[in-house]
Structures are given as structure tokens and as C-alpha cells.
């Protein structure tokens, strides 16, 4: 059994996810609808729901389905027997790039937090009515937060927490990144991804979200429950925390892709893993001098060629080559995916598309990339954090304008049980040190 109470919404989400994967749902569809509308409070009904989820995890693929998507891509198992070494011959100084990545990540989280779970149309209207279009400074986000929090009846304490300038606030993305650093520093190659997940739960209360997207509850703590049982096996919760693996394996995209895949494999399958591999490889390549379209094209080598993710990323590249503007590109994503649907809003594929669009159309300009990510909808915080981290890694700390900084920009709050504040420059330095160390690793066990 699971460590989570299954709801009717979970069952319906599992059915919709199965459709997205091209599975033949004819044998279970009626049962799912019937059970999802019933009372699931009893242990008997929970067991029935569990068995139904288990049945859905074993459904066959419809004949004629156009994609070929292994649950775990080749070389991406939970234990990696051989990690590709890639090109580790880079001699450029990565220290400023690592600080740029961490700072960008924190700025992205801070700016996007005011628009979390707000529909794109509503967010754009709020920005324009407040004369904050485009978002051009951290002060803009403070003003926006004030309006959003006031209109939503949010407490004064929350508004003050967003506006305070002595540190970057704790968030599960930065906490997960800090936990990843600690695990690799302490254990080197001798750790399992499930240990990282448990380390997060024990030491960083926000590193794994305490809601239905906590996929560890669905699968990671029970060897008898496969990740494929989770309705959220392709959600963006692992995608948004994959950048750190690309930073640790900077200049080595194959290794970054495999590290990210291994980390997410306890809870995600198929495109939930491919997006992690893809984003980590982008982050690993971000310090190199190349155009974003070229970098995106190279990143396709790290995901299955005949997957939904590869298909949509190739479409995004084609849109750019045809001189389609940013707004039209984002609009097309919203035509394909319904942001009002929670499964779609946090699904890894549309969010990977938004990340790719924000990066490609920005041309490595930090301000442009941030604005594109934060105003494109879906998982706004995760996407903006990822985009700003990748662009920050490419540009370096010195290229991030002062208008995005807070007075205590080197202070990062955490939800760690041992320390509630860390130095951003120290986190960047630790990441840089691991880049050097991991070049000597051949295995994760």
C-alpha cells in the first residue's frame, strides 16, 4: 500500500496521464470514473483505488501509438553502472558562472513567487494595469506581490516576507540543490537517489513538497510500488530541481543527464525523466559559448529520439527558425495544454517547452529570459528558477544587473533543521569544487 491517501482527483489524473502516454484505458475507464465519484475514506476503498492504480500502471500501449518511450531511458537506471565522461577538457574559470547560476535561481524564485498558480491571462492583466510590463527589476516584483497578496487576502506577514531584503527566502528548489551538494560531498559516488530523497525529507522540510506532488510518498519509500503507479509520474516537480545536476557536472552534459535521470527515477518515468535529463544537460552546457538553439539541438541527444518531449522541442526550434514571435510561441503551448487543468499546469512537457522558449527567444539576455519565463504561465516558479539559473550560469554573476539584487543578496534562507541560513557564494563555491571532484567519478552506486 501507499503512504498517501488516494483521492478521486488522483484517480482521474492517473487516467488522464495514461491517455497522454498512449495507453489503452478501455478496460479501466468506467471503473475509474465510478470509484472517483465514491467515498474513498475506508481502508477497503483505498485498497480498491490502489489496485486500480496498479492496473493502470500495467496497461498496454495502443496499437499505432507514434512514440517509443521507455519507462527509464537507456543508461538512466537508479544505479548507474557507467557514467559517460563527455568532454572534461574545458579550462575556463567556472567560479563566476556557478555564482551566476545560484543568484539567477534565487532571483527567478523571488520574482515568480507572486504569480504562482495565477492564470497567465490574469497575471499579464495585473502586470499591465500596474505599469509593470515588462518586469525590469526586483522592485517590480515587490510591487506586484503587494497587489497580488492584497487582492488575495494574504496576510501581512507573507507580504513582508516577500519584500524583506536581508536574504533570499527558503524554497524547495534551492533546498533540494543544497541537499544534493551535501549528499555528493558526504558520499561521493556512494549514494542512492532514494537516500537523497530521504535526506531531503529529514533535513529540508520544503525540499520535497508536502502535497499530492510529493512523488516519494507514491513510490520512493516502497520497493514494491513502481513509480509508474503515480498519477504524477510525468509532472514537473523533478524537472524544476534538475539544474543542480547540470551545475555539478558542468561541461559534461552526458554525466549531468544521467545524474538527473538517476535522481528522478525513484518517482518519475518516461517524459518525467527525459525532461530532467534534458534540462540537466542544458545546465551543463550553459557555460559554453554557443547559441541557445544550438545548445537545445545538442541536448536532444540526451533524450529518446522518438518521444513526445523530443517532438515538441523540435517544434519549438522550428518555430524559432520561422521567425515566429515569442507571444505566438507561448500561445501555441497554451493551445496544446490547458493551464487551468492542474495535471497540465505541472506536467513536465509544457513546462519544458516554456523553458526552451524563454531561453531561445531571450538570446542569453537575463532580463528578457526572466520576463519571458515569469509571464508564460504553467509552473511559473519552477520554470523561472530554471531559466534564470541557466542564463545566470552562462552570463556569470557579473552580468546580472544590480536592479535584481537585494541588500543581503549573499544570504540564502533554508528549511534545514541544522542551519537556517547559508552563504550564496559559499554554495556556488561548493558547486564549483564538486565540478572538479565529479570529473574523477566513474560510477554512482
Where are these regions (language model features)?
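Structured, active/binding-site neighborhoods that engage oxygen-rich ligands
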Residues: 1-445
